[in-house]
């Protein structure tokens, strides 16, 4: 039996979505991350950093906190993606630094949801 070639269902011919710069620089410590999220609640990177920091504590309470922070970052990111032309599919490249807040929040959400 000859091998079949199947179409890649994940392949998307859409152009990659490139988010604009985040309103906050990446916070370096928990206090900076809290201050950044308070100043700019739409900051993708602030929520991602808060989630990542909470994941490192590895307690039940910090896991719930991480999930909430990651979920907030994820939804703030979806809002930004849609404002920039994303329609629910298509590449969001890691190489474009402003996309990293979304991708990091998505990663943190997946980790927190499994704890």
Which residues does each predicted region cover?
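N-terminal alpha-helical interaction modules that lie
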Residues: 1-91, 97, 106, 111-115
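Short, solvent-exposed interaction modules
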Residues: 102
């Amino acid at each position: 039996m000859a091998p079949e070639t199947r179409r890649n269902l994940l392949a998307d011919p859409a152009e990659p979505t490139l988010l604009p710069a985040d309103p906050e620089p990446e916070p370096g410590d928990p206090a900076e991350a809290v201050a950044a999220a308070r100043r700019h609640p739409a900051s993708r990177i602030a929520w991602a950093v808060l989630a990542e920091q909470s994941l490192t504590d590895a307690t039940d309470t910090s896991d719930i906190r991480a999930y909430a922070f990651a979920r907030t970052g994820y939804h703030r990111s979806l809002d930004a993606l849609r404002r920039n032309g994303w329609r629910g599919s298509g590449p969001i490249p890691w190489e474009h630094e402003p996309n990293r807040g979304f991708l990091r929040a998505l990663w943190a959400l997946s980790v927190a949801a499994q704890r």
